[in-house]
From Swiss-Prot:
Binds a second Mg(2+) ion via substrate during catalysis. It catalyses: (2R)-2-phosphoglycerate = phosphoenolpyruvate + H2O. The gene is eno. The lineage of its organism: Bacteria, Bacillati, Bacillota, Bacilli, Bacillales. Mg(2+) binds at residues 242, 288, 315. (2R)-2-phosphoglycerate binds at residues 163, 340, 369-370, 391. Belongs to the enolase family. SMART domains: Enolase_C, Enolase_N. Its cofactor is Mg(2+). CDD domains: enolase. This is Enolase. It is found in: Cytoplasm; Secreted; Cell surface. Its EC number is 4.2.1.11.
């Protein structure tokens, strides 16, 4: 047993230059843990509350000193004295202290920072790497990376509607080789874009953000890059999309406006038709948030049409919330959940969501946020839970590469027992 003797939070910056919360946990044994909380750009309306100060004289109102003070003045006195290995007890105590259904009193960014820092301190105390401490002896599966190499939507200043176009190197024999494949396609894409006279600046998540003529054109240039790198689309490398359709859903009309396509007023059924058409023309294996987060009928239709052959991921739809996920499972909506630790606010609840998904035959994709830091906790979570997939950006920007590098270290440490499933991590669809 090692008792927590101090908890301290400070305001630091994320990859977009916005403030976020860093937390440190100290124990009587000398064990120490530190964690930094990520932040999203496109957020689901049902997510746990990210507490911002709203003081326009500091960081344009995006300061997090209220959340920092909540850690130092409210949470710290509550959990000092706890055994640092009592993760569930500590998380439960913070949830009860907050007392709201969405962590709106203390802020999910305050609570999550403590939750993750506690886990790091506990791992330090028992002398284990974080993935092994959290996952036990069976934590050995390296995740298939979903690499966001073209950014659009709210992640970039361009005219592409869909937020992310990803490559998935499912044909690699190891995680290390999947990273090599992804990097080679990334560099090939830069050359393709350059040759077309297109911008090769990168967006929030390290992918390119060119002004392409349509969402279809984004898929076409990626196919060209895959082939230029010496791989076969639909064999070595598949495609994925995070549509983030809530960002272009018109709440007043109840329709979808695809400005990049020059098409407005699309119904849910017409959006599903569009996805089906794209999946026939391109080797798309995963679609995230294809319909608005509240368009459950649309999601049901999408699942009926594509759910047996395409991974349909609920992000804004489920917001890493077991109640939302349970409802989706009951109604047969989607077949996968995106796992974002700051959507729900504690590690305990995050692990519960992953377990619920797996029991129902859904896949779970551990994910970063667009506002990231050098913190690589999600890499360890992906291995600890044998989640099978991770979405943590492109092959540029240190805030993204930090997670890939941590996974490379873990694979190296695991040695011969490391598992990389590639295409088999999409176990609930036919390919």
């Amino acid at each position: 047993m090692s008792t927590i003797i101090d908890v301290y939070a400070r305001e630091v910056l994320d990859s977009r230059g916005n403030p976020t919360v860093e937390v440190e946990v100290y124990t009587e044994s000398g064990a120490f843990g530190r964690a930094i909380v990520p932040s999203g750009a496109s957020t689901g309306e049902h997510e746990a509350v990210e507490l911002r100060d709203g003081d326009k004289s500091r960081y344009l109102g995006k300061g997090v000193m209220n959340a920092v003070n909540n850690v130092n003045e409210a949470i710290a006195p509550e959990i000092v004295g706890f055994d640092v290995t009592d993760q569930a007890g500590i998380d439960r105590a913070m949830i009860e202290l907050d007392g709201t259904p969405n962590k709106g009193k203390l802020g999910a960014n305050a609570i999550l920072g403590v939750s993750m820092a506690v886990a790091h301190a506990a791992a330090d105390f028992v002398g284990l790497p974080l993935y092994r401490y959290l996952g036990g002896f069976n934590a050995k599966q390296l995740p298939t990376p979903m690499m966001n190499i073209i950014n659009g939507g709210s992640h970039a200043d361009n005219n592409v509607d869909f937020q992310e176009f990803m490559i998935l190197p499912v044909g690699a024999p190891t995680f290390k080789e999947s990273i090599r494949m992804g990097a080679e396609v990334f560099h090939a894409l830069k050359a393709v874009l350059h040759d077309k006279g297109l911008n090769t600046a990168v967006g929030d998540e390290g992918g390119f953000a060119p002004n392409l003529g349509s969402n279809r054109e984004a898929l076409e240039v990626i196919i060209e890059a895959i082939e230029k790198a010496g791989y076969k689309a639909g064999e070595n490398v598949f495609l994925g999309m995070d549509v983030a359709s809530s960002e272009f859903y018109n709440k007043e009309t109840g329709k979808y406006d695809l400005a990049g396509e020059g098409r407005t007023g699309l119904t849910s059924a017409e959006m599903v038709d569009f996805y089906e058409e794209l999946c026939k023309d391109f080797p798309i294996i995963s679609i995230e948030d294809g319909l608005d987060e509240n368009d459950w009928d649309g999601h049901k239709l999408l699942t009926e049409r594509l759910g047996d052959k395409v991974q349909l991921v609920g992000d804004d739809l489920f917001v890493t919330n077991t109640q939302k996920l349970a409802e989706g499972i009951e109604k047969g909506i989607s077949n996968s959940i995106l796992i974002k630790v700051n959507q729900i606010g504690t590690l305990t609840e995050t692990f519960e969501a992953i377990e619920m998904a797996k029991r129902a035959g859904y896949t779970a994709v551990v994910s970063h946020r667009s506002g990231e830091t050098e913190d690589a906790t999600i890499a360890d979570i992906a291995v600890a839970t044998n989640a099978g997939q991770i979405k943590t950006g492109s092959m540029s920007r240190t805030d993204r590469i930090a997670k890939y590098n941590q996974l490379l270290r873990i694979e190296d440490e695991l040695g011969e027992i490391a598992v990389y499933d590639g295409i088999k991590s999409f176990y609930n669809i036919k390919r």
